[in-house]
Amino acid sequence: MMYINKGKRDILIFPQFTNIGKIENIRKQYDELYEVLPPHIPLAFPFESSMSNDELKNRLMQVSKSLAPFEIIMSGVSLHEDKKANTNYIFLDVMSGVKELKMLHNKIYETVLEHQTNFEYIPHITLGTTEKDHIEFELNDVFKTVITKISIEEIGENEESNVIFEINL
């Protein structure tokens, strides 16, 4: 495994599903980061910044003031091609809560990180990768929880997640 994100930070949600074990079982087979990073919904992808952790926390607290906890429902899987890496990502799809997640993502990039993204944000949990053009398993379960906080992590030596702080919604 190539460790390309070591030392970077990212902003994400660690959802607390009662049936999260089903997600973990699939990730164990398809996701090389299974052992070092719990299932998560990315809000800001790994980034480098000279901004201190305190400043980052203060900016995120300003964003979170306008937000309340919200429910998400996830179900279904989809493939998303990464032409640069010559692979397909397997996503667990968000069915409800998409609007809130996209708004949060956009606010983070616009007001916290102060730049625009040049891609369409698709809220999801990455279940893994495959070189195949189809998914070889079924996942018909529904995953439901209330999102109450966002996490900021620093990515460690072996791509492990080191949560620096969390912000309550």
Sequence positions of predicted segments:
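Histidine-dependent nucleotide/RNA phosphoesterase domain, centered on the 2H-phosphoesterase fold
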Residues: 1-169
